[in-house]
Amino acid sequence: MTNPSALTEAEFNEVKQHPVFSYRMVQKIPALNHGAKLAVLQHHERNDGSGYPLGVKAERIHPYSQIVAVADVYHAMTSERLYRRKQSPFRAIETMQREQFGKLSTEAVAALVNNLIGLQTGAVVKLSNGEMAEVMFIPSDEPARPIVKIIETGQLLSLSVQRDIYIEEMVQG
């Protein structure tokens, strides 16, 4: 999509049909199991029924679809768009952890976080304020908000307390 302006309601309704068109394309492929085909159809569904194209709730959304939905949201947040800048992976993970309840599978979000965050004690990161820091401690409940030591000053900073600063990128793992 190359339209820099907001979609009209009619255009958005057309966009919301892409899972149906995609499902029809893969429906007769014998190499794909039923769950994989449903993931194509349901990857924009949300647990609270607010998704599309069917508006079904959690109990009717296939587990594969819930996994793909989490990956799709993460990809959308970390990709550059005409209408907004991409977010850092850490910022995206933090947002997903905060806003997942009722929308996304908490298990799928946790799996993404655990496999993607890749932070280790001793890693060097660039913070949103431009400072470089070393990861000192990673809390299990907020892995995207560790305690870091500012390299220039030696000051310890808890990103779970200092909420206006976040990890922009990994510099050295």
Model-derived regions: residue spans:
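Histidine- and acidic-residue-rich, metal-dependent catalytic cores
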Residues: 1-173
